[in-house]
Amino acid sequence: MLKKLFGMGKIQEKVTEEVIYSPADGTVMDLSDVPDPVFSQKMMGEGIAVEPSSGEIVSPAEGEVIQIFHTKHAVGIRTRSGIELLIHVGLETVNMNGEGFTAHIKEGDKVKVGDPLITCDLELIKEKASSTVIPIVIMNGEAVGSMVSAGEKAARKGESKLFTIKAK
């Protein structure tokens, strides 16, 4: 009886493979083409990027929000397989101190693919930051067994596959 009350005894299925979807409408680009060496030289990790055509940013995977920067320009998500993704909206947007960004989530929230994360003003980002590009980076690469790009060029938020990850 206690096992049923507290959810014990449930067998949790271990997720080892996940598809990461685009967090925004726009154009998919290789991380090495991002005009910032921190991302292009993969100092933060492997990933991909999207040049957005709209300011609606959604969750690219099912998981838990583990970080939302106080400036609302970046979100960290831990997927069901334990992969930690950073969705970084724009380059040098930290200097905007949250201006032009609205967060729709908080740390600890559970998210599904397509759930709204952030809304941003792309025109303001173009004016005040160096780029609107959105890098999606795997922060704990040691947990990744393999990563296969989907080869998409046009991105639709929450629908277009960016890559498939197999966790170790």
Curated annotation (Swiss-Prot):
<dbReference type="Pfam" id="PF00358">
    <property type="entry name" value="PTS_EIIA_1"/>
</dbReference>
<dbReference type="InterPro" id="IPR011055">
    <property type="entry name" value="Dup_hybrid_motif"/>
</dbReference>
<keyword id="KW-0762">Sugar transport</keyword>
<keyword id="KW-0963">Cytoplasm</keyword>
<feature type="domain" description="PTS EIIA type-1">
    <location>
        <begin position="36"/>
        <end position="140"/>
    </location>
</feature>
<dbReference type="GO" id="GO:0009401">
    <property type="term" value="P:phosphoenolpyruvate-dependent sugar phosphotransferase system"/>
</dbReference>
<keyword id="KW-0418">Kinase</keyword>
<keyword id="KW-0808">Transferase</keyword>
<comment type="function">
    <text>The phosphoenolpyruvate-dependent sugar phosphotransferase system (sugar PTS), a major carbohydrate active transport system, catalyzes the phosphorylation of incoming sugar substrates concomitantly with their translocation across the cell membrane. Plays an important role in the phosphorylation of EIIA-deficient PTS transporters. The EIIA domain can transfer a phosphoryl group to EIIA-deficient PTS transporters, enabling growth with maltose, N-acetylglucosamine, sucrose or trehalose as the sole carbon source.</text>
</comment>
<dbReference type="GO" id="GO:0016301">
    <property type="term" value="F:kinase activity"/>
</dbReference>
<keyword id="KW-0813">Transport</keyword>
<protein>
    <recommendedName>
        <fullName>Phosphotransferase enzyme IIA component PtsA</fullName>
    </recommendedName>
</protein>
<dbReference type="InterPro" id="IPR050890">
    <property type="entry name" value="PTS_EIIA_component"/>
</dbReference>
<keyword id="KW-0598">Phosphotransferase system</keyword>
<dbReference type="InterPro" id="IPR001127">
    <property type="entry name" value="PTS_EIIA_1_perm"/>
</dbReference>
<feature type="active site" description="Tele-phosphohistidine intermediate; for EIIA activity">
    <location>
        <position position="88"/>
    </location>
</feature>
<dbReference type="GO" id="GO:0005737">
    <property type="term" value="C:cytoplasm"/>
</dbReference>
